[in-house]
From Swiss-Prot:
Designated name of the protein: Large ribosomal subunit protein uL14
HAMAP family: Ribosomal_uL14
InterPro entries according to UniProt: Ribosomal_uL14, Ribosomal_uL14_bac-type, Ribosomal_uL14_CS, Ribosomal_uL14_sf
Pfam families: Ribosomal_L14
Subunit relationships: Part of the 50S ribosomal subunit. Forms a cluster with proteins L3 and L19. In the 70S ribosome, L14 and L19 interact and together make contacts with the 16S rRNA in bridges B5 and B8.
């Protein structure tokens, strides 16, 4: 579960390395986010020459969480890190590559471009 002030690793080549969550979108009472949720973040670390710079406010979708997500069949999927992909207003990724596995649940939230770019879908 991702909440305000959580740090996310960036799983794309947009130029950011680490994000700090400012807000979980989806209602005024919403406290936590899980895989497939959109969050507003600020870039805390960035690589030189990237698309995004340190201090930029961006939107990202959560693709991996340590706490995991429950599936329809009762199983859970957990990852070793919390990670996100920076997206545009039309839910397309800002980067051109995705690093690491992503959860199958992203298909249900219409992030098909991220799923197609990912090297592995679990």
């Amino acid at each position: 579960m991702i909440q305000n002030e959580s740090r996310l690793k960036v799983a794309d080549n947009s130029g950011a390395r680490e994000l700090l969550v400012i807000r979980v979108l989806g209602g005024s009472k919403r406290k936590t986010g899980n895989i497939g949720d959109i969050v507003v973040c600020t870039v805390k670390q960035a690589t030189p020459g990237g698309v995004v710079k340190k201090g930029d406010v961006v939107k990202a979708v959560i693709v991996r969480t340590k706490s995991g997500a429950r599936r329809e069949d009762g199983s859970y999927i957990k990852f070793d890190e919390n990670a996100g992909v920076i997206i545009n207003a039309d839910k397309s990724p800002r980067g051109t590559r995705i690093f690491g596995p992503v959860a199958r649940e992203l298909r249900e939230y219409d992030f098909m471009k991220i799923v197609s770019l990912a090297p592995e879908v679990l």
